[in-house]
């Protein structure tokens, strides 16, 4: 790759990133040459399932985890202390979810390097799209990467409806950051609309693994870090590979996480959202998770300019219909609600010639006591059940829960989720649906995780809102 790093471009980018400090280069005329070399040779985060059992990456990860577990409780890099950072500070269900976890992963990776002495170490990721079982390196008695609280077994497989390639491709092709990366918020613990990346594969995998992974002390399970590295890979692919802009709203870009993290020596770190934009350009890169054909490879200078610029992103609605009626979902008891729409606007979402979309927002959702079920959404299918295949044309999407309604530490227990019904209603129309009606019948089906008997599988939904969104305008 042509990295396109002129001295002028580098200094502009380094100023925005704080790259000189992060890269450990703070003076002298050799800064540019040394940093250029380091960027070009930055560590590669690889798919853990593609590594041999004795690969140095896996061994370094094991050594790092063992060393963190052996640190005294007074050390901020201690294994439990690292998990408590997540418990006490992590944003979920809002637009700070992605940049906060990006910083969290980076400083954890730095701690691994410091404790093991392996400066070339890069945290691997678990590609649950290609390997739907917990990878082999996380199992075995005496293995620092094992966790005995897991509910999933070595043979358990995550369901394609949550992590399959079709689902991921749809998520990565979502152009609106507020739908992809979760909705607007003014504080990091405020609940907004949960985005499709967080609400579907992210939440599902936490519940699928279970045990420690099912609550906000989830970093106690070493799987956590590779799972979130996959989420990070998704964001990099969405933003830098597929060229979808992040929002440039100053409420987001200028927000500071202070001081949530600690550096490799255990000292507190203050991090601004905009500081994280160039991490995957300057500090690490990924072995490609989702190859995309036909895209021109861009220089790092081009990527840097695009990542920093972002765009003014809105989610505007031409019409919205709200149904307030508390629904209680249990496994084996689907619920249906009819939502009437204005005929002319509804037709605008049915035609491919227009870019209007039909978006369902489920509001004031109270999750189950245990995160051992998820919800599938169907359209005009009153007999839908947990066994209904997701390749049925009436299927629209899924969402899952991370944490239970006992987790009051993380703010309000109520959630909001968004599901795009556009393609489903368009596919149903040629089959005779909506010919004489602009009413949409929505079915919600509670589904248990595979090979698992739900303990307390009740979900309450107090509000359904069906909206016709205007075409996305980026400025």
Go through each PLM region and give its residues.
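Intrinsically disordered, flexible peripheral segments
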Residues: 2-4, 8-95, 99-475
